Structures are given as C-alpha cells and as structure tokens.
Swiss-Prot record:
Keywords: Amino-acid biosynthesis, Histidine biosynthesis, Hydrolase, Methionine biosynthesis, Multifunctional enzyme, NADP, One-carbon metabolism, Oxidoreductase, Purine biosynthesis. The lineage of its organism: Bacteria, Pseudomonadati, Acidobacteriota, Terriglobia, Terriglobales. One of its GO terms (molecular function) is methylenetetrahydrofolate dehydrogenase (NADP+) activity. This is Bifunctional protein FolD. NADP(+) binds at G167, R168, S169, S192. InterPro entries: Aminoacid_DH-like_N_sf, NAD(P)-bd_dom_sf, THF_DH/CycHdrlase, THF_DH/CycHdrlase_cat_dom, THF_DH/CycHdrlase_CS, THF_DH/CycHdrlase_NAD-bd_dom.
Amino acid sequence: MSAIVLDGKAYAKQLEGEMQERVERIRAKTNGEPPILATILVGSDPASATYVRMKGNACRRVGMDSLSVTLPEETTTEELLAKIDELNADERVRGILLQHPVPKQIDERACFDRISIDKDVDGVTTHGFGRMAMDEPAYGSATPAGIMRLLRHYQIPLEGKEAVVVGRSPILGKPMAMMLLAANATVTICHSRTKNLPDVIRRADIIVGALGKPEFIKGDWIRDGAVVVDAGYHPGGVGDIELSAVIGRCAAYTPVPGGVGPMTIATLIAQTVEAAEKAAGI
C-alpha cells in the first residue's frame, strides 16, 4: 500500500503565499499599516523562545509585523494581565499569543481568558472554545485547526468515519475531538485511564496522537488502511505514534517532523490575517 504523505511543510508554504496576497489587500485598506501578531513570552525557556522566533519569522514572510513581548521569570499574574490589557487596547495588534507554559506562579487560565476573543487567534480562551463547541464562529486552537486544514487539503474523508483522539488537553485533544465531530466523524477520546486502549485504536479509521509521550501508540494497534495523524514531537525526531511500523500499511500519515508542526504556525498566521480582515472590513 502506498500511503499519502500529509505534507504539512509543503502545504504551509502554499498557505503562506495565499496569506501574502491577503495581507497586501489589508495594507491597501489601512494606509500601508501591516497587521501585528503580538507574542508574549514569560521567562527564558529556550524551546519557547525558539517557537516565538519561528512565529515572528512566519509573520514577516507574509508581510505582517511581529511584536515580541518578553517578561521576566518573576512576573506576576497581575502584571501579565496588565500587559494583555494593553495589547487588547492596541488597535494595531490583531492577534495575541501567550506562549505556553508560563511560570508556575502565574494563573495561566486567567491570563488566557483575558485575551479579547477578537484577538484570540491561538484559540485558547474558554469563551472561544465554548463558541466553537456550540458551532458559533471562533478561532480554533491552532494545532487541531491546522490538522483539520491539512485533512481537508488532502481530501481525507471524515464524514461517518470513526476517529480516535488519544489525549484530552484543553488546547489539543479536546478541541481536536470537537472539530472532528463538527465534520461529522464519530469521535472517541482516549486518555491515561482508558481501558483496552489498543482495542479502541484498532477500530479507528482516523487516529490522532496528541498525548505527548514518544511512540506511545504502537504500530500494531493501528489497522491497515487507517489515517494516522501524529501531533507529537520529541527528541530524536519521533512523535507520539510508532510511525515506522505503519507507513507501509496506512492510507495516509503526517510525517514527524514536517507534518503537524508547520500547520500550527501557518494556521496561527491565517487566523491573524482573518482577524485583520474583519477589522479592516474586508
């Protein structure tokens, strides 16, 4: 069986080209002012700093501006909330991203929820998640929304399919399940206390690995002809799924790296562009 490679890197590059054109139209209506994506990094975690740089580079590639806000490790919840309020009030800023995780003394949920829903381009607020769950307009959490874009691009059938999401985090597993449900898939969410996990996964037409444990999902748990989406990334270039054991048997799969990761950033940029278009009346 020759599997379809769900190439997120290639599709993200295509999306960036489309975003460039849309940003040009926005700037034509705003006297040349580019939309701004503001990213907030609290502390100096090297991985988080790398992600922030990658997002800034993506902004510049499509003609947007990136505002990088770095706060000290000892920042309090109140100080971070004040900074978010400042960015909410700045009409030049069309998207706000608070880099996860924040230091333990900060109430992360309160800070996420302080972001204006119109600028919640990373889909992290409870208001936005609730609207999405009720089929109302909202920006989706960037990683699952990126996965959905990738599946649609490659015309992977979802309606009536049995989908299993392994992981239930509020920014990945849960919104992923809601998006698949909205696409008329029949969805099962699995987690650390799921009984007979291999048997549940063997039923799946579509498997999404979203639990953050390297190669936790074994190849022999996955049936022939399944669509395999791996949202994990760990040292050594492996994800949450033992991909090497299924590439020859599955219908389609996301490579690690180069599958889900590039789509997360591309979706964040696309949702910021959409927010800027709404603000510009386009």
